[in-house]
Amino acid sequence: MEIWMFTAPFKQGILKELAKCWRDYDGKKYCMGIEKGRGGFRHIQGRIKVSADTNYEIIERIGKRKTRTRKGYRMFDTLSKAGIHCQKTDQWTDYESKDGYYIMSDDTEEVRAQRFGHPTEEQEDVLRLLESNNDREITVWYDETGNVGKSWLTGHLWEKHKAHQVRLTGSAEGIVKDVCSKMDQERRPIVIIDIPRSGKWTPAIYEAIEVIKDGLIDDPRYSAHAMNIRGTKVMVMCNTKPKLDRLSKDRWIFYNAPVGADKG
């Protein structure tokens, strides 16, 4: 197996065109995204994993050349003539997905629909409220009935590399460890705590919210590696009411405030 990095000029429909090429010629795995370089130049950056003996066929298809050469021979030069520059690498990452406009070989139709879909007006309202939060506030999207798009929005923001979803554990330390581990892999501006209908607010959630918003977090599993994430937006999605006295009054900003709480 070989891994290749490639850069291609942007044109309408290029992602689908390249994806079809990778499928037709047995590309084992790929990730490619649209990026904007210096001066606003838009281009495609990607990686593909292929069997060594299929290299020439991929070159011929993308490079639109009819003259055969030995398999894999002068790959860089051939692709360059088609405006596609290629370089062999030993490393596979999904780095090309970082800007949120990308496709991968293991995508399903449902995943792509969520990634490229557009939030509803209500979801946009929630995001505007979240964006207005200061370094102490959290946004709580409370909805007693459900089915208003909270989980869809969580997935959308995750796919666009804008949010991490917290894995709820039985302790505040476990929640903070999870956030620290994910932020260490990739800094994202939003942390989402999605409390399922069968779940409930716990002391661990209140405590973790305060620690995350205060900014300094660490994961003792990795020699107390600490990082400062102050300014990260925190949104809690829930179907049950929180106990408002568990956090300072100035922390709470509600979308669809429950009875007894002031709406942000």
Language model feature labels by segment:
Residues 1-26, 51-142, 162-168, 262-263:
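Catalytic "initiation/cleavage/transfer" segments centered on a nucleophilic residue
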Residues 2, 27-28, 42, 82, ...:
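Short glycine-/polar-rich loops that comprise or flank the Walker A/P-loop
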Residues 152-153:
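Hydrophobic positions on the alpha1 helix immediately C-terminal to the Walker A/P-loop
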Residues 144-148:
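Walker A (P-loop) phosphate-binding loop of P-loop NTPases
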Residues 160-204:
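AAA+/P-loop NTPase substrate/partner-engagement loops
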